[in-house]
C-alpha cells in the first residue's frame, strides 16, 4: 500500500480548444504509480456503496479510500486471490459484491471476507464462453458478461452461466462475438454493443434469446470500418449515445431504433473518431474519451477539447474509461497516463508562470500588478520586466530593457496607472513612465537632487494623489511627493532637523485613504499624516507600531481600506491589525492549527470578505462573521508564499496575487464549496502494529473491519490501533477526523491523521466513534461506530474472584479471634482522640486569652505612645534623658507591632474582618465582575449571560470583600464547567433581600459533599467527575466567601438543581438596619493621590488653592470648568492648566451645572463618581440644555471598567480619560479638543458650502443650526430681517442666540446673517445670469453700494471682479 499525502501531479491549465473559439481552463489532479497506483494504464473505474473507488489497471486491482491505495494482484499460491492481474472491467451488484473481469477469468469479490471467487471457461455448457471479460453489468438480479467469445448471463440462484453466441445465419443472434458494452435504459430495454454492431434484446425465453441488430447509415467521410461499439449511455431526455472505435459518436433518439452519426454536426467534425468511453457529468455535459484526449460536448452544443498529440502516451491523452462518482467529480483513466480527477473545485484557482500556456509570464517572481481601463493587466516581474496581458484578445507581450528603448530595469518593484501610462518603480534606477498605447518610455526630467535620491535607493511603492502628484516610497530615502507639472518635490525622512519625521526611511507601502490621510508603512513602524497639512511648515505625523526609545518598530508590509472605511495593516511576522479610532487592534488569523503572522497584501470582494496573501497561502476573512478559511497549495494555489502588495482586483470580479512562483487568479464568487461528506470507513485494525487478518488463529475479525460492528479482545490484545479514511477525493490531504473511545474518554480527538492508537488496561465495554470532515470542513452528521469488548485477565475473571472470596472468608474467620483485642485498641484510640480534642480546645482558649490580653494591652500602650511623642517634640532638657525617652518610644512601638501581628493572626483564624460598607449600585458592581470573565467565556465558547430585574439596586456592601466572593464563585463555575457550557449571573429581590445566583451547567457536586463544601480546606474529590482533570484549589475559597457573606449579615448556600450543574446563591439584606454605624463608611470612593501625577513633571506646579490672579480672566484664553470632589486633585489640575486657560472650579455636578449655565465655559472636565450629582448625569444635563449643549465634556474617573466608559459615552461625553492619566497626554488631549472647536468655527467662514453636522458636536445643536440656516434662507430677500426677528423665529432669547451663534461660528448674529447672504450672493454671481444690483436686493441688502463694500471685505475683490473671474472660466 502507498500513502497519498498530497496529490503529486497537477495537470494545470489544459487549454480547452473550442470550435467556437472559447477559452476555458480544466485542471486535473492525477495519480500515478508514484502515488501508489499499481500501474499507469487505467482500464476501468467503479465506486462501491460505501464510497471507495476501485481502479482496474493492466497490473492489479486498486482500492482507493481517499488516502491510501490498496492493491490486489494474482497470487498463484492463494486460490482466494484474483484470477489475473490484468483488469478489464469492474461492476458492483446490489448485494455489494464486486465483479471483476480480467484477461483470464471472472471474479466475484466479497468485501466482507476480502476474498475472490473465480469463474473460468470449461467444457461444461453452464460455464463461461471465454476467460477474457470485457464488460460487466447487473440487470434484473443477473450479471450480464461481455466476453471475447460472446455474451454470458450469470444466474445468482443457480450459479450457472447461459451463453449467447453470434451466428451469421441467424439474424436474431448477436451481430458480433466480441461483446464490448452492455446497457439497460430507463425503460428497461437492454442494449448490447459488439465489435460488429449494436443490438437490442427483443425477446427471451428458456430456450432462446433474440436480438435486433440496429442498422446505421455509414458516413461517407468515415473510412468503412465496421461499427465497433465501445460504450453506451443515456441522457436525461432518454436519448442513447453510442461511442464507437474509429466511427465516432452516434445517437439514438428516445423511442427510436435508428443510429444517427453525430459526426455530421458542424461543431463536432474535428472530434477524434476513435472514441473509447463516454459519460455525463452533473451538469449534463457529455465527456467523450478518445485516443487524442477528452472532448466535452456541452448542453448548448459547444465542444471543448482537452488533450495532447496522439503520439504522446503520457498524461491525459489515450482515454480508456470515464467515470462520474457520487460527488459529481469526473474520473478519466488513460493508457499509460494514469488516473485523472476533475472537479469544479480544481478550477477554483488558476495559476500562471513562465511555463503557462495561457498568460505566460516573462519571469516567475511577480512583485506588482496593475490594470488599465481597457482590459490590460500588467505584471511587474523582478527579473523579466513587465508582462502585459490583454483580456480581450487573450494575448501577452513582454516589455523589457531589450525590446523597449529607455526601459531602465527589468527588476520591477512597483506599477501604477496614471493617465493611460504606467509609472514603473524598479531596483536602483529612476522611476519612469511607460506609455502602453505608443509602447514607448516617456521622459521625465527629475531635478538632479531627486535623481540622486532615486539612484541611491530603489522605488518599492508608487501611489497616485492626483493626475499631477505622485508619491514614491523608496527603500532607504523615505517617501517622495513629486509634482509632475512643476517638478517640485517634498521628501519625508527620519532626519530630526528636517520638517518631517518618519519612523524609518525604508518605505514598503504607501496608501491614501478616503479621508485623505497618507499611510506610510516602513520597515520599522507605520506613519500617518493628513494631506490637508502637506503645505504647512510643520506637518504632524502620527506614528504606530514604533518604540521611539528603542528606535525600533514593526515591519509594515501593506495597508488597506475596506468598504466600511476601516484601515487594515498587514505586518511581517507580527500579525494583522485593524484601526479602531485611535489605536490598532490585532486580529487573530488562525484556522485548523495554521497561524498566519505575515500578511503581504489585502483585497476585498463583494461579499464582505477580505482576502489576505501570506506565507501560508491565501486567507478568506469574513468581516461580518469573522470566519476564516485558509487555501494553500493542496487547494490548487501555485505557492503558499506571496510578495508584498502584489495583488489586483480586476473589474471587481477577478483577483490576482503575485509571488515568487508566479501568479494565482480566481473569482471569489465562483469558488466551489465541497458539500459532499461521506461516512468514515474503517480501513484496518491492528494489534501491536500488525494487521489483524479475517479469520486467523484468534478469530478476532470474522469479516473486513469496514463491515465489522463489534470486536471481542482478550486482555493481552488491548494494545491496538484503528485506521480509517473518508472517501472524499477532493484535496483529500485536507480531510480531518474526530474520534473518541467512550468508556475511556468523552472529549473528541481532532486530527488529520488516519489512525487512532489505544492501550486499554481495564476490562469492559467500549465504543469507538469516528467522524470526518472533507477539505471544506463539512462534517459527517453521524459517526462510524465500533463496539469493543475487552475481557479480563484470568486472575481477574469471575472464577478467580470466587477463589479470592473463599480465601477472604477463611481469613475473616481467623480475624474473629482477635476482634476483642482490636475493640480494646479502638477504645484506647477514642480516648486519645478525646484528649487531643480537649488539648485543641485548651489551645484555642489560650489563643483567645492572648487575643483578649492584646486588646487590653493595646489601649494603654496607645495612650502611652501619644503623650510620649508629644513630650519628645516639646522636650528641651538634657540629652541623656532625651535618649532614654527615645529608647522608651522604640520599645513601645515594637511592642505595639507585636500586638498588631497577634491580632491579625487571630482575625485570619476566625475569619473576622472589619466591614467597611457603603451604599452603592450592586448591579453595576456585579456587572463589572461579570465583564472580567467575558473574554474567557468567549474563548471557551461558553454561553455566558447576565440577568437582573432592575438596572439599579442599592445595597450596603464592602466592595473589596464582596468582590472576592463573586470572583471566587464565577471562577469556580468556569473551572468546573466544560467548554461550550452555560454560566449565568442572575439578580432578583424581594422585600427584604437581594439574591445573586451563579448558575452553571458543569459537573455538579455529589450529595455526599454538599454539606462539607464550606468547611475550610475541604475540596470535592477529583473522582466526583472522573473524565475531567480539573485544576485543584486550596480549599479555602468557599469558606472565606461564607464568612464574608455572614459578615454582611447575609448567607451563601448551594441551591438544589434538577439538571447537571450547580447554583450558588448569595443573599444580602436590603437597607442598612442590619449594620452598625461603625461598619458603614460615608464615601465609597478611594481618594486620588496626586503624587502619581507630580512624578511625571520636571517642575511641580505650585499647589495654591485660590489666589487673586485666578479670579482675573483673560479674554484671549479659553475657559475650562473643572469638576472634581477630591480637592487636592482639583487644585492640581487647576494649576496644571491655569497658565494656558481661564479656570472655573466646582466640587460636585450640581454646582458645576449652575456655573456652566452662568459662565458658558469652552470645556468642562468632570469626574464621574461625585456626591450630589455624578459626572455622567452632569454630562447629560449639559448636552440636553440648549444653552450649554455646545460645550465639550471630558469625563475623568479612576474607574477603567468598560461599564463606566459605555455609560459616559452614552451620556454625550466628547472624551473619556481614565485615572491615573499621563500628564503630557492629558494636556495634549485638552488642547486638541479646543483647537478642533476653533477649526470648526473657522470652517464656517472659509467654506463656500457647509452642513450643520460639520460644525456642531451634539444633535441638539445640529437641529438648532439647521433651523437657523433655514430661517436665514427663508428671509434672504427680507431687508427688515434683524436679530430680534431671528431670535423670535428660532424660539430662543437674544442672549441665547448670541451665545449659540458665537459658539458655533465665532460670529455675532448680525455677522452670521450677513455671512450667509454674502455666500448666497457669491453663488448667484458664479452663474453670471443676474446683474449685481438685482443680486444685492435678492440677498437682503438695501443698497448695492453697501453690498459691494461688504462683498469686497469678505472676498477681497468687488462683485464685478468676482463675476468676471467666473465668466472667464466658462
UniProtKB/Swiss-Prot annotation:
Its EC number is 2.7.13.3. Residues 1119-1234 form the Response regulatory domain. Residues 1266-1365 form the HTH araC/xylS-type domain. One of its GO terms (molecular function) is sequence-specific DNA binding. The modification 4-aspartylphosphate is found at residue 1167. Residues 1-20 form the signal peptide. PANTHER family: HYBRID SIGNAL TRANSDUCTION HISTIDINE KINASE C, TWO-COMPONENT HISTIDINE KINASE. This is Histidine kinase P4. It comes from Formosa agariphila (strain DSM 15362 / KCTC 12365 / LMG 23005 / KMM 3901 / M-2Alg 35-1).
Amino acid at each position: 500500500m502507498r500513502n497519498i499525502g498530497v496529490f503529486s501531479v497537477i495537470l494545470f491549465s489544459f487549454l480547452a480548444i473550442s470550435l467556437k473559439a472559447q477559452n476555458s481552463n480544466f485542471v486535473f489532479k492525477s495519480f500515478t504509480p508514484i502515488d501508489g497506483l499499481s500501474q499507469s494504464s487505467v482500464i476501468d473505474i467503479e465506486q462501491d456503496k460505501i464510497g471507495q473507488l476501485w481502479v482496474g489497471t493492466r497490473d492489479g486491482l486498486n482500492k482507493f479510500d481517499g488516502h491510501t491505495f490498496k492493491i490486489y494482484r494474482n497470487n498463484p499460491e492463494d486460490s482466494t486471490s484474483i484470477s489475473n492481474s490484468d483488469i478489464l472491467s469492474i461492476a458492483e451488484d446490489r448485494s455489494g459484491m464486486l465483479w471483476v473481469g480480467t484477461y483470464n477469468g471472472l471474479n466475484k469479490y466479497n468485501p466482507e471476507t476480502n476474498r475472490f471467487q473465480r469463474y473460468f471457461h470449461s467444457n461444461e455448457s453452464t460455464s463461461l464462453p471465454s476467460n477474457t471479460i470485457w464488460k460487466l453489468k447487473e440487470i434484473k438480479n443477473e450479471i450480464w458478461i461481455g466476453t471475447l467469445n460472446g455474451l454470458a448471463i450469470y444466474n445468482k440462484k443457480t450459479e450457472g452461466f447461459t451463453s449467447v453466441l453470434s451466428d451469421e445465419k441467424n439474424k436474431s443472434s448477436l451481430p458480433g462475438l466480441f461483446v464490448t458494452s452492455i446497457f439497460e435504459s430507463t425503460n428497461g430495454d437492454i442494449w448490447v454493443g459488439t465489435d460488429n454492431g449494436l443490438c437490442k434484446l427483443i425477446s427471451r425465453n428458456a430456450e432462446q434469446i433474440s436480438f435486433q441488430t440496429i442498422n446505421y447509415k455509414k458516413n461517407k467521410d468515415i473510412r468503412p470500418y465496421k461499427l465497433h461499439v465501445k460504450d453506451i449511455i443515456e441522457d436525461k431526455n432518454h436519448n442513447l449515445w453510442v461511442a464507437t472505435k474509429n466511427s465516432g459518436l452516434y445517437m439514438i433518439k428516445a423511442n427510436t431504433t435508428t443510429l444517427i452519426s453525430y459526426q455530421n454536426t458542424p461543431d463536432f467534425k474535428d472530434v477524434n473518431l476513435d472514441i473509447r468511453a463516454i459519460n455525463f457529468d452533473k451538469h449534463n455535459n457529455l465527456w467523450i474519451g478518445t485516443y487524442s484526449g477528452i472532448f466535452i460536448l456541452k448542453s448548448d452544443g459547444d465542444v471543448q477539447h482537452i488533450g495532447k498529440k496522439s503520439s504522446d502516451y503520457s498524461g491525459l491523452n489515450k482515454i480508456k474509461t470515464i467515470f462520474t462518482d457520487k460527488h459529481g467529480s469526473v474520473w478519466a483513466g488513460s493508457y499509460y497516463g494514469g488516473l485523472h480527477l476533475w472537479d469544479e473545485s480544481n478550477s477554483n484557482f488558476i495559476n500562471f508562470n513562465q511555463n503557462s500556456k495561457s498568460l505566460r509570464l516573462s519571469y516567475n517572481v511577480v512583485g506588482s500588478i496593475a490594470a488599465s481601463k481597457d482590459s490590460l493587466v500588467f505584471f511587474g516581474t523582478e527579473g523579466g520586466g513587465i508582462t502585459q496581458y490583454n483580456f480581450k484578445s487573450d494575448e501577452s507581450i513582454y516589455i523589457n530593457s531589450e525590446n523597449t528603448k529607455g526601459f531602465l530595469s527589468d527588476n520591477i518593484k512597483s506599477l501604477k496607472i496614471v493617465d493611460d501610462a504606467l509609472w514603473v518603480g524598479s531596483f536602483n534606477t529612476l522611476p519612469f513612465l511607460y506609455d502602453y498605447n505608443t509602447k514607448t518610455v516617456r521622459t521625465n526630467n527629475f531635478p538632479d537632487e531627486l535623481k540622486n535620491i532615486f539612484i541611491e535607493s530603489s522605488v518599492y511603492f508608487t501611489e497616485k494623489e492626483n493626475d499631477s502628484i505622485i508619491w514614491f516610497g523608496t527603500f532607504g530615502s523615505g517617501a517622495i511627493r513629486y509634482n509632475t507639472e512643476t517638478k517640485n518635490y517634498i521628501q519625508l525622512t527620519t532626519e530630526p532637523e528636517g520638517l518631517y519625521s518618519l519612523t524609518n526611511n525604508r518605505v514598503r507601502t504607501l496608501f491614501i485613504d478616503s479621508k485623505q490621510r497618507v499611510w506610510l508603512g516602513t520597515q520599522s513602524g507605520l506613519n500617518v499624516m493628513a494631506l490637508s497639512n502637506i503645505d504647512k511648515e510643520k506637518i504632524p505625523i502620527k506614528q504606530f507600531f514604533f518604540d521611539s526609545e528603542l528606535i525600533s518598530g514593526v515591519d509594515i508590509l501593506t495597508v488597506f481600506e475596506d468598504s466600511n472605511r476601516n484601515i487594515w495593516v498587514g505586518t511581517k511576522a507580527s500579525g494583522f491589525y485593524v484601526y479602531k479610532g485611535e489605536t490598532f487592534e490585532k486580529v487573530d488569523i488562525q484556522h485548523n492549527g495554521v497561524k498566519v503572522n505575515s500578511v503581504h497584501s489585502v483585497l476585498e470582494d463583494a461579499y464582505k470578505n477580505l482576502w489576505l496573501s501570506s506565507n501560508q497561502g491565501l486567507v478568506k476573512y469574513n468581516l461580518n462573521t469573522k470566519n476564516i478559511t485558509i487555501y494553500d497549495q493542496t487547494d490548487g494555489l501555485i505557492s503558499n508564499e506571496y510578495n508584498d502588495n502584489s495583488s489586483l482586483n480586476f473589474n471587481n470580479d477577478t483577483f490576482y496575487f503575485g509571488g515568487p512562483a508566479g501568479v494565482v487568479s480566481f473569482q471569489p464568487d465562483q469558488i466551489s464549496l465541497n458539500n459532499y461528506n461521506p461516512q468514515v470507513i474503517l480501513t484496518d485494525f491492528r494489534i501491536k502494529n500488525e494487521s489483524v487478518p479475517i479469520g486467523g488463529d484468534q478469530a478476532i475479525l470474522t469479516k473486513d473491519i469496514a463491515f465489522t460492528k463489534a470486536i471481542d479482545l482478550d486482555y493481552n490484545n488491548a494494545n491496538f490501533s484503528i485506521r480509517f479514511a473518508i472517501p472524499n477525493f477532493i484535496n483529500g490531504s485536507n480531510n480531518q477526523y474526530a474520534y473518541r473511545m467512550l468508556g475511556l474518554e468523552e472529549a473528541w480527538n481532532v486530527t488529520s491523521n488516519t489512525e487512532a492508537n489505544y492501550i486499554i488496561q481495564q476490562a469492559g465495554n467500549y465504543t469507538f466513534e469516528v467522524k470526518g470532515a472533507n477539505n471544506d470542513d463539512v462534517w459527517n452528521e453521524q459517526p462510524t461506530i465500533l463496539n469493543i469488548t475487552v475481557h479480563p485477565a484470568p486472575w481477574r475473571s469471575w472464577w478467580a474472584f470466587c477463589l479470592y472470596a473463599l480465601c477472604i472468608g477463611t481469613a475473616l474467620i481467623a480475624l474473629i479471634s482477635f476482634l476483642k483485642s482490636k475493640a480494646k485498641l479502638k477504645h484506647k484510640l477514642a480516648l486519645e482522640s478525646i484528649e487531643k480534642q480537649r488539648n485543641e480546645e485548651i489551645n484555642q482558649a489560650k489563643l483567645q486569652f492572648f487575643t483578649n490580653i492584646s486588646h487590653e494591652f493595646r489601649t494603654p500602650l496607645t495612650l502611652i505612645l501619644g503623650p510620649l511623642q508629644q513630650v519628645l517634640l516639646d522636650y528641651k532638657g538634657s540629652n541623656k534623658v532625651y535618649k532614654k525617652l527615645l529608647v522608651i518610644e522604640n520599645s513601645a512601638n515594637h511592642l505595639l507591632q507585636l500586638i498588631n501581628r497577634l491580632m491579625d493572626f487571630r482575625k485570619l483564624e476566625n475569619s473576622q474582618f472589619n466591614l467597611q460598607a457603603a451604599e452603592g449600585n450592586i448591579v453595576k458592581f456585579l456587572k463589572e465582575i461579570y465583564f472580567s470573565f467575558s473574554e474567557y467565556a468567549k474563548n471557551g465558547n461558553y454561553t455566558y449571560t447576565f440577568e437582573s430585574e432592575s438596572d439599579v439596586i442599592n445595597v450596603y456592601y464592602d466592595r473589596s470583600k464582596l468582590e472576592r466572593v463573586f470572583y471566587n464563585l464565577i471562577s469556580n463555575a468556569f473551572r468546573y464547567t466544560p467548554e461550550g457550557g452555560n454560566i449565568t449571573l442572575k439578580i432578583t429581590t424581594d422585600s427584604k433581600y437581594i439574591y445573586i445566583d451563579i448558575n452553571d451547567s458543569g459537573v455538579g457536586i455529589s450529595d455526599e459533599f454538599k454539606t462539607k463544601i464550606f468547611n475550610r480546606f475541604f475540596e470535592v474529590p477529583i473522582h466526583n467527575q472522573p473524565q475531567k482533570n480539573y485544576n485543584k484549589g486550596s480549599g479555602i475559597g468557599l469558606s472565606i466567601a461564607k464568612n464574608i457573606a455572614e459578615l454582611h449579615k447575609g448567607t451563601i448556600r448551594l441551591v438544589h438543581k434538577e439538571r447537571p450543574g450547580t447554583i450558588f446563591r448569595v443573599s444580602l439584606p436590603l437597607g442598612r438596619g442590619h449594620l452598625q454605624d461603625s461598619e458603614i463608611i460615608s464615601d465609597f470612593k478611594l481618594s486620588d493621590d496626586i503624587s502619581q501625577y507630580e512624578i511625571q513633571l520636571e517642575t511641580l506646579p505650585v499647589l495654591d488653592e485660590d489666589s487673586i490672579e485666578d479670579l482675573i480672566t483673560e479674554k484671549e484664553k479659553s475657559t475650562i470648568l473643572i469638576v472634581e470632589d477630591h480637592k487636592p486633585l482639583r487644585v492640581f489640575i487647576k494649576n496644571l492648566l491655569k497658565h494656558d486657560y481661564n479656570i472655573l472650579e466646582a466640587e460636585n455636578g450640581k454646582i458645576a451645572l449652575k456655573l456652566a449655565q452662568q459662565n458658558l465655559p469652552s470645556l468642562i472636565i468632570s469626574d464621574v463618581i461625585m456626591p450630589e450629582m455624578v459626572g455622567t448625569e452632569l454630562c447629560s444635563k449639559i448636552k440636553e440644555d440648549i444653552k450649554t449643549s455646545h460645550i465639550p465634556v471630558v469625563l475623568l474617573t479612576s474607574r477603567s471598567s468598560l461599564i463606566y466608559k459605555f455609560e459616559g459615552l452614552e451620556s454625550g461625553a466628547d472624551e473619556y480619560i481614565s485615572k491615573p492619566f499621563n500628564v503630557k497626554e492629558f494636556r495634549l488631549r485638552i488642547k486638541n479638543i479646543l483647537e478642533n472647536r476653533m477649526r470648526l468655527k473657522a470652517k464656517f467662514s472659509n467654506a463656500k458650502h457647509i452642513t450643520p453636522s460639520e460644525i456642531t458636536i451634539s444633535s441638539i445643536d445640529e437641529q438648532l443650526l439647521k433651523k437657523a440656516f433655514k430661517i436665514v434662507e427663508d428671509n434672504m430677500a427680507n431687508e427688515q430681517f434683524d436679530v430680534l426677528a431671528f431670535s423670535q423665529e428660532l424660539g430662543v432669547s437674544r442672549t441665547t442666540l448670541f451665545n449659540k451663534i458665537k459658539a458655533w461660528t465665532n460670529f455675532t448674529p448680525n455677522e452670521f446673517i450677513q455671512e450667509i447672504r454674502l455666500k448666497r450672493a457669491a453663488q448667484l454671481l458664479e452663474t453670471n445670469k443676474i446683474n449685481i444690483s438685482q443680486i444685492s436686493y435678492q440677498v437682503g441688502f438695501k443698497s448695492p453700494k453697501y453690498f459691494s463694500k461688504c462683498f469686497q471685505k469678505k472676498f477681497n475683490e468687488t462683485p464685478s471682479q468676482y463675476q468676471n473671474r467666473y465668466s472667464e472660466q466658462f
